[in-house]
Amino acid sequence: VPARVLNYLSDFSAFRPTFCEIANSSTDGLTLDGNSFLPQLHGETGNPREFVYCWYNRDMEPGKTQVTARNQRYKLYKGGKFYDVPNDLQEKQPLVTDSLTPKQVAIKEELQDVLNHYEQFDRLSQVIDGRQ
């Protein structure tokens, strides 16, 4: 595979299906959240992610968990902060809800749906924060 930079979203969940595809190992019967990125490595379109979900708590301290969903351009934090990442790499200026374009409103709603979907699996935050 030639060296190249790919502008596709990917995360850790993509490694298992990619390695299974490389090894010609079936993923039938497995519940996988990620998509193989092997086609993209070969210059094909593949099935890239439309969003990435991230859960982060570096020190496992109560109240310090950061949860985000993002697409190629925008990132939404649980709690509502919404950023135009290429235009605000350090995330210093969250977009103001009243100033969003209709397209940005739709994207924010899509990313909120992602956060809502994955919240049902977020048992670790509940334990860390003492909610369980």
Q: Which residues does each PLM region occupy?
A:
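C-terminal cap/loop subdomain of S1 sulfatases and analogous C-terminal strand-loop tails that border
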Residues: 1-4, 8-87, 118-125
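Second-shell loop/turn segments in exported
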Residues: 3-5, 97-100
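Acidic/polar, compositionally biased interaction segments
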Residues: 128
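Cytochrome P450 catalytic domain signature, combining two hallmark sequence patches
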Residues: 47-48, 99-103
